[in-house]
Swiss-Prot record:
It comes from Sinorhizobium fredii (strain NBRC 101917 / NGR234). It catalyses: L-homoserine + acetyl-CoA = O-acetyl-L-homoserine + CoA. The gene is metAA. It is an enzyme of class 2 (transferase). GO terms for biological process: L-methionine biosynthetic process from homoserine via O-succinyl-L-homoserine and cystathionine. This is Homoserine O-acetyltransferase.
Length: 307
């Protein structure tokens, strides 16, 4: 089944050209099924690129999904035109009366700040609390995952001496997990962050279970059954060129940066990188959406009521 997004969203044409099944809003209303309602709180600076990355993965699943783009109310990003925000996004204040089958909270380029120093921290805390009563399943990504696990469990983040940057091998620690159905025992995941959470802190919280881990990069994916939350600390959603774009952005800005680990062929930045994580990215999002579909109430208003 396709993903339902506005016909004029820039991601629409890109996804159609890639062969992703996309449905116009007009066509969607003719299907006599309830689409899954998924919200995307997009905290990334380049919102259009993130929209494409997430919609690509959601749109490849066999279920109809209606994606709602959400933004922080009082914060104006510098890298996305205001007309795009007003045309396609709703503020959290505008959607907080609704309920969602799934909700994604992305990363943000603020990880070197203490959480309390982030401009929109108070609003984000309110959103975290809101997900407990208005969302069936929440997927927190990178800094969004670190912020969420800190908010709910006090798990701290630690600064790294240098940026964790590249493609690293990860291990499947729980092959029986519904979220890792079809996963290999060992697989590649893109990593791009300046901070980390540590296994020792997570192990102290009985409700948290580590599903993916890297010997070099540490914890990657944590599941919390009680709150129906996933914490993904790395970037399975990244495009083939995402790490390359970040690398050359920093090089052009004069920021000291090493070549991303195990990314460019022969460590030659002039060669196009090969995507070695795409299939597992699709598996992960497909598994998340399938589990959501199997367990969410048919009547949206029952989400968060325990019925």
């Amino acid at each position: 089944m396709p993903i339902k997004i506005p016909d004029t969203l820039p991601a629409f044409e890109t996804l159609v050209n890639e062969g992703v099944r996309v449905m116009t809003e007009t066509a969607a209303v003719r299907q006599d099924i309830r689409p899954l309602q998924i919200g995307l709180l997009n905290l990334m600076p380049n919102k259009i690129k993130t929209e494409i990355q997430i919609a690509r993965l959601i749109g490849a699943t066999p279920l109809q999904v209606e994606l709602t783009l959400v933004r922080i109310g009082g914060y104006r990003p510098k890298n996305t035109p205001e007309e795009h925000l007003f045309a396609f996004y709703e503020t959290w204040e505008e959607v907080k009366g609704r309920k969602f089958d799934g909700f994604i909270i992305t990363g943000a380029p603020v990880e070197t700040l203490d959480y309390e120093e982030v401009t929109y921290w108070d609003e984000l805390k309110s959103i975290f609390e809101w997900t407990e009563t208005h969302v069936h399943s929440t997927l927190n990504v990178c800094w969004g995952a670190m912020a969420a696990i800190y908010h709910f469990h006090g798990v701290p983040k630690y600064p790294l001496k240098e940026k964790a940057f590249g493609v690293y091998r990860h291990q499947n620690l729980k092959p029986s997990s519904v979220y890792l159905n079809g996963f290999s025992d060992d697989f590649a995941v893109p990593v791009s962050r300046w901070t980390e959470v540590r296994r020792a802190d997570i192990d102290r919280v009985p409700s948290l279970e580590i599903l993916m881990e890297s010997k070099e990069m540490g914890v990657c994916l944590v599941h919390e059954k009680k709150g129906n939350r996933l914490y993904m600390f790395n970037h399975v959603e990244y495009d083939s060129t995402s790490l390359s774009d970040e690398y050359f952005r920093d090089v052009d800005a004069g920021v000291p940066i090493k070549l991303p680990h195990d990314y460019f062929p022969h460590n030659d930045a002039d060669l196009p990188p090969q995507n070695r994580w795409r299939s597992h990215a699709h598996l992960f999002f497909g598994n998340w959406i399938n589990e959501m579909y199997q367990t969410t109430p048919y009547e949206l208003e029952k989400i968060g009521t325990g019925d």
